[in-house]
Amino acid sequence: MDKAKKKRIIVYVSTIVLSIIYLFTAYKIAIGDGVFGDKEDIVTVRAKVLRITDEKETVSDEESGGKISMQYVFFEAKAVSGEVRGKTLYAVQERDLLYGLPQPTVEVGDKVILVYEPNDDGTADYYLSDFSRITPLIMLCAFFFLLILIFGRKKGLDTIISLVFTCLAVFINLIPAILNGQNIYAWSIITCVYITVMTLMLIEGLNVKCFAAGVGCVGGVLVAGALELILRDQIKMTGVLDSEWLYLYNLNPENPIDLKAIIFAMIIVGAVGAVMDVAMSIASSLCEINEKSPDLPARELLKSGLTIGRDIMGTMANTLVLAYIGSALCCMLLMVTYSSNVGQILNREQIAVE
């Protein structure tokens, strides 16, 4: 085994071990004893519907036209999780028909999530919380990972590992830290730096290309964060984008979450993936040019980098704008409907944050 390959293995294994240590330590610090750990104990069970036993409907008063307002579907289901696994459960689905898009009616064979809450007349011990979507989502993820492994091979495996670590850093470190009232700015920056370093070390290893891409990525993300801090006062940002933000603010009245800091976290976490993509693309292209033409002057190499960057910028700008529009399309439709002109739409805080 040559030295380069041995070094690559050492860096690879060290990155995985250090990532596990970091994630575990950060989780212990982030979890604390705050809001995140204070949850109502709700018993939920995954089950498969065996048969429909009864259906009932209630009619609203004459003021609303005497229309059917509620439908109750009673059914039996076999539990597939929890302490009651294997047992037959008696449950009910409550459908509010006054809404334009009520929940689909439960059918035999459906996989559902039930919540334990006996009703007054004793006809059901559980009620339908939602339809279970875990199985199709797992199949979709498995198919996605399979494609990555087929086309990426060793790089594909590295990509999957880095993706798992990235999700863990966000869901077991950053989110608990925010909910427990810790410094959102510090945790956001630390999380983004960790994601950048970990991903590049696993994908590329410890070399000049990794260093250049890492510096470019961290620098770009910090610039994005700095712009948010500078502009927030100029645009009179409140941090309240809709009712969900108010609910988040009131989770812990004694120590409310800083909504402006949440926006800061949104921006840099959302930017780190795109910036890392651009940084690695430029660094990889320049390394290939340098390997093929080692005698190329640094000035010419810099010009090549700028040319590549301009080409990437032309498509990446569209990518980012369309990604944000796509994720907020429903909100955009409502804004267009209830706004009198384009200026009023652009002046909204939701658009400013996006």
Model-predicted regions and their roles:
Residues 1-42:
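Hydrophobic secretory-pathway targeting helix
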Residues 89-97:
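Short, structured beta-strand/loop micro-motifs enriched in basic residues and often containing a Trp
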Residues 97-134:
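Extended, hydrophilic extramembrane loops/domains of integral membrane proteins
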